[in-house]
């Protein structure tokens, strides 16, 4: 069992929580600069751990909210930074609307590898609650988020997020700046909810994307024919694969889709 100790607080690292603690202050400063955080803003940090990033955010914004699932780490943050609002809970289960209040959130976090995708889809669900997020995650996942069409990384994650967010790759973070050291590098990305998305049915679009990419080597015709009436779609379009279509092309294709009624 790996144990990490900081300021007389020792915890057994929980692999199921994906706990890897950042140790390089140059990286945390860079994350806060990239976030654009300002003193008057409503800031939320996901998973502060031992407060490496927290310490730098405080330099900009003396009081803000953190969400920490681990009881021992939540207690540590309360003691170390009594001015902060500590929510001891699973980020995937909290009501972000209640946390937001009257002001949209600016979110920062070194998010656990094990729940990166669930956190991203949670942010997608609550996209009206925040103005910007700066997140560190596994490098491979970051590359999938910012991927472009006709690349192996381009898939459901890229399309779902890029449809509703402006996404940007910040910088790579080597594995040696974490304790315990993970087996892969990390990266920092930013996501900003788009002001306007040309979709009247976002949930329907999400279902369509999952169908279109269900088997990525198959054509749109083969992936969609069981779930949608394709009569209005040109045959040359149906011969293509979903991975070759840009976001706007997928928007336009979705508008032509008519879901089949279940018998």
UniProtKB/Swiss-Prot annotation:
The keyword Cytoplasm applies. It is an enzyme of class 2 (transferase). PANTHER family: DIMETHYLADENOSINE TRANSFERASE, DIMETHYLADENOSINE TRANSFERASE-RELATED. Its EC number is 2.1.1.182. The keyword S-adenosyl-L-methionine applies. Specifically dimethylates two adjacent adenosines (A1518 and A1519) in the loop of a conserved hairpin near the 3'-end of 16S rRNA in the 30S particle. May play a critical role in biogenesis of 30S subunits. InterPro entries: KsgA/Erm, rRNA_Ade_diMease-like_C, rRNA_Ade_Mease_Trfase_CS, rRNA_Ade_methylase_Trfase_N, rRNA_adenine_dimethylase, SAM-dependent_MTases_sf. S-adenosyl-L-methionine binds at residues 20, 22, 47, 68, 90, 110. Signal peptide: none annotated. One of its GO terms (cellular component) is cytosol. GO terms for molecular function: 16S rRNA (adenine(1518)-N(6)/adenine(1519)-N(6))-dimethyltransferase activity; RNA binding. The gene is rsmA. This is Ribosomal RNA small subunit methyltransferase A. It catalyses: adenosine(1518)/adenosine(1519) in 16S rRNA + 4 S-adenosyl-L-methionine = N(6)-dimethyladenosine(1518)/N(6)-dimethyladenosine(1519) in 16S rRNA + 4 S-adenosyl-L-homocysteine + 4 H(+). Belongs to the class I-like SAM-binding methyltransferase superfamily. rRNA adenine N(6)-methyltransferase family. RsmA subfamily. HAMAP family: 16SrRNA_methyltr_A. Keywords: Cytoplasm, Methyltransferase, RNA-binding, rRNA processing, S-adenosyl-L-methionine, Transferase. CDD domains: AdoMet_MTases. Pfam families: RrnaAD. It is found in: Cytoplasm. NCBIfam families: ksgA.
């Amino acid at each position: 069992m790996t144990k990490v100790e900081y300021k007389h607080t020792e915890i057994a690292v929980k692999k199921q929580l994906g706990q890897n603690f950042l140790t390089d202050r140059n990286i945390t400063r860079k994350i806060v600069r990239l976030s654009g955080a300002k003193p008057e803003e409503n800031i939320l940090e996901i998973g502060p751990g031992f407060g490496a990033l927290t310490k730098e955010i405080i330099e900009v914004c003396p009081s803000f909210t953190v969400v920490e699932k681990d009881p021992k780490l939540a207690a540590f943050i309360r003691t170390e930074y009594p001015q902060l609002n500590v929510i001891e809970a699973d980020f995937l289960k909290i009501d972000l609307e209640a946390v937001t209040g009257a002001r949209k959130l600016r979110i920062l976090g070194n998010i656990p590898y094990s729940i990166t995708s669930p956190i991203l889809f949670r942010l997608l669900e609550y996209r009206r609650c925040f103005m910007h997020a700066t997140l560190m995650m596994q490098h491979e996942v970051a590359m999938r988020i910012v991927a472009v069409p006709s690349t192996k990384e381009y898939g459901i994650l890229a399309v779902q997020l890029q449809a509703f967010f402006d996404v940007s790759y910040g910088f790579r973070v080597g594995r040696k700046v974490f304790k315990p050291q993970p087996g892969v590098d990390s990266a920092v990305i930013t996501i900003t909810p788009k002001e306007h998305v040309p979709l009247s049915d976002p949930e329907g679009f999400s279902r369509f994307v999952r169908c279109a990419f269900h088997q990525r080597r198959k054509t749109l015709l083969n992936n969609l024919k069981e779930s949608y009436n394709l009569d209005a779609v040109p045959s040359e379009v149906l011969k293509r694969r979903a991975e070759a279509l840009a976001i706007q092309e997928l928007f336009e294709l979705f508008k032509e889709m008519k879901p089949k009624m279940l018998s």
